[in-house]
Design a protein with these regions (language model features):
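Generic protein-terminus/edge-of-domain signal
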Residues: 1-72, 79-81, 85-88, 110-119, ...
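Solvent-exposed, amphipathic alpha-helical segments
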Residues: 54, 143-157, 194-205, 249, ...
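Ligand-binding loop in jelly-roll beta-barrel domains
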Residues: 78-102, 106-108
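Amphipathic alpha-helical segments enriched in hydrophobic/aromatic residues interleaved with Lys/Arg
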Residues: 112-169
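Short, flexible helix-adjacent loops and helix caps
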Residues: 156-160, 182-186, 207
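Basic/polar phosphate-binding segments, predominantly the helix-turn-helix DNA-binding elements
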Residues: 175-182, 200-248, 253-295
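Intrinsic-disorder/low-complexity linker and hinge segments
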Residues: 185-193
Length: 295
């Protein structure tokens, strides 16, 4: 079977916020323009799949998984997938450009459940045999459906500011998912939650003296295993991630506070202000003092 490549311009026309929603009601083929439900495809954006009725077999990167009402899972960009079978399927697809939403998604990293579901579950999907996906009970799914229908109505309204309303609603849905994932009693999900806790701890306590040994204990993993998993999910090492986080926080304080550069360095976990200045220049190609004057 040939793989179709879907691109963001097919779903996010214009310069508005790159968030879109599509729905599938039943088993009829081609239910909307660009419907690739039954066609093996990839896309250069992320897709959140929420199944509200029925079920089927969903093929992801060479493996078929059974899915049913209540299941929620993320398809990351450049992931091959499609429905091999579907039975009375009703689902909502939320498509979004995670690069465009990076600033908002970064804020959500303070939530361990968000990190576990959105960052780590896709990586562990194969080795967990999809047992770490989120599954909502009917009453919770009915509550979420109200949010989904509100988002769908906003997209279809075409009213001024609808892109901002879409953004606010999708962030609300992400928070709801993060909260429910953190409450999951699934042992596989709890493994990922501990990894998510590593990210949220660093985000919320970035000035602390974090080490790989300390972080790997939170994740309940051997340091070597933890380093590999973290690099796969985040694209960098834990220490580089922490350094980037501290520098970013420092940049915000330089612009939004009257604190001295030495105070900001200490607040962000740098005991040596000269070392802080060197690292800051590596990231922003200017000194902290120059950055403050510029902004």
């Amino acid at each position: 079977m040939k793989t179709v490549k879907a691109v963001r311009s097919d779903f996010f026309p214009g310069e508005g916020c790159p968030i879109a929603m599509r729905t599938i009601q039943g088993d009829a083929p081609i239910q909307h323009e660009g419907d690739l439900t039954d066609i093996r495809h990839t896309h250069d954006f992320a897709e959140l799949i929420i199944i509200t009725r029925g079920g089927g077999m969903h093929w992801i990167d060479g493996i078929s998984y059974e899915v049913a009402a209540g299941d929620i899972f993320l398809i990351q960009d450049n992931t091959e997938h499609y429905f091999q079978e579907r039975h009375d399927l009703e689902m909502y697809n939320i498509m979004f450009d995670d690069k465009y939403l990076a600033e908002h998604l970064r804020s959500l990293r303070s939530l361990s459940g968000f990190n576990a579901f959105f960052l780590f579950e896709p990586i562990f999907r194969r080795r967990h045999a999809f047992m770490s996906k989120l599954h909502l009970a009917p009453e919770l799914m009915n509550s979420l459906r109200k949010n989904l229908n509100g988002m769908l109505a906003e997209e279809r309204s075409g009213l001024p500011g609808s892109d901002l309303m879409m953004l606010s609603k999708v962030l609300e849905i992400f928070v709801l998912i993060a909260r429910e994932y953190s409450r999951s009693s699934n042992s596989k999900a709890q493994t990922l939650y501990r990894l998510g806790e590593v990210i949220s701890r660093m985000e919320n306590q970035y000035s602390e003296n974090w080490t790989v040994a300390r972080l790997s204990r939170i994740a309940a993993m051997a340091p070597s295993t933890f380093l590999g998993v973290f690099k796969e999910a985040m694209g960098t090492s834990p220490i580089e991630y922490l350094l980037n986080l501290r520098i970013t926080k420092a940049a915000g304080l330089l612009v939004n506070s009257q604190k001295s550069i030495t105070e900001i360095a200490q607040d962000c976990g740098f005991n040596d202000s000269n070392y802080f200045s060197r690292q800051f220049r590596n990231y922003y190609n200017c000194s902290p003092r120059e950055y403050r004057k510029r902004f």
